[in-house]
């Protein structure tokens, strides 16, 4: 199951191919991704972050073993072969425990790595870039690399213990700013310099040697860098290839290495393709997929209001707003401005903090109510044209069933299609 190593080999041979990573735990997003990969007969890379999923449950309430079981069960139900499914762990390190002393945070990180590897995750992003309670700010490359090497050793031992061989594929390094979109308004972003990328690589190579891990270097397939892409609440910084030329050329000197780009959400299809051509050949996407889910649900809620008496409506949007106001912890520190600005951000921000609320039981009940209301009788075509125009074209051509669920999934797949096209290669 060396899909990633083979992808890198082909890319280094000039194929200009890549792979996208679906970073979401939402069942409809995952179903959309599995069905899309199945239809296109491609492997599928699904990643969990250290915030979402950890040995204590993360914010999803799932351990790595739970997440794997959930994804594999979904794949089985959709007849997707498990050997075409790659599970990755993103930003694995002391990220969740920065408020603890480094010794304690790293002990937790050891256990985090063990839980991911034992559960069968094969793509492991080692990220120890964050300072803990008693650390200097920022950490030196050497400290970051030493901690990553420590975790790599734990990962290798765990993999051999559980699977009889060490076949993990690693990603190292980190992008700045923090995972999940920038908190501030952006105008321009500094691209990682070739010297900084080389320093990260050399520090890691040296630290891995000290741990006796020379042999795993060919399995370090990617370095996370900042190619100059990011988004905030209402803006996207588009990829500018010319600004990343030196960085792109630098990786050509490394035989088994490509770059991984985070926060590629909302880039244009042309930018996504150019990123892959420029060796940023692993494209991470998450918020853009749940943003598309939210768009589809808001559109269906508007259709429901046209068709269903007010008393019988799901009230999905109002339920969502009420829950977000009752439990503001996932958006309050991100969204600023007056009451109206924050209301708009809660519903529409590119950073899509609303994604943290979909599992809430009240919201889930309203979602189920919405789907029931619209599944009772066919949705009139003019309303699909009004609120989901891209799906309307497919409904009219006969390639899409106009049921609520299929409309949602297809809308998400429109985003996946952009990533698929960007990664196809020549």
Swiss-Prot record:
Record-level GO BP terms: carbohydrate metabolic process; D-tagatose 6-phosphate catabolic process; phosphoenolpyruvate-dependent sugar phosphotransferase system
Signal peptide annotation: none
Pathway: Carbohydrate metabolism; D-tagatose 6-phosphate degradation; D-glyceraldehyde 3-phosphate and glycerone phosphate from D-tagatose 6-phosphate: step 2/2
GO cellular component, one term: plasma membrane
Function recorded in the entry: Component of the tagatose-1,6-bisphosphate aldolase KbaYZ that is required for full activity and stability of the Y subunit. Could have a chaperone-like function for the proper and stable folding of KbaY. When expressed alone, KbaZ does not show any aldolase activity.
Oligomeric and partner information: Forms a complex with KbaY.
Membership in a protein family: Belongs to the GatZ/KbaZ family. KbaZ subfamily.
Xref: NCBIfam families: agaZ_gatZ, PRK15458.1
Name of this protein: D-tagatose-1,6-bisphosphate aldolase subunit KbaZ
The encoding gene: kbaZ
